[in-house]
Amino acid sequence: MTAETQQRILAAVDEGFDAQLATTQAFVAIPSTRGAEGPCQDMIGDLLRERGYEVDDWHINLDDLRDLRGFGPIEHDFSKARTVVGTYRPATNAGKSLILQG
């Protein structure tokens, strides 16, 4: 990475810091106990869409997972469990992929 590229990245982080802090504060203020993560998932999906990502949002079907190695018993209501994934597709596929999961 060149020094110029590094400086551009640092400047972009500095420029967006207040907005990112406000977004983080809004996110952590949303109650998200097990089984009630929906509002957090909604916010993440909205943020991804605003940034131009293709968003997939689906409910998790435990029957699809039961036979997979490592599956453990679920002892709580999982009927509202969802997964939200954002995908960015560049004009050309010339680089590496990055997955962020949380």
Could you describe each region identified by the protein language model?
Residues 2-102:
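Acidic/His- and Gly-rich active-site-bordering loop/insert found
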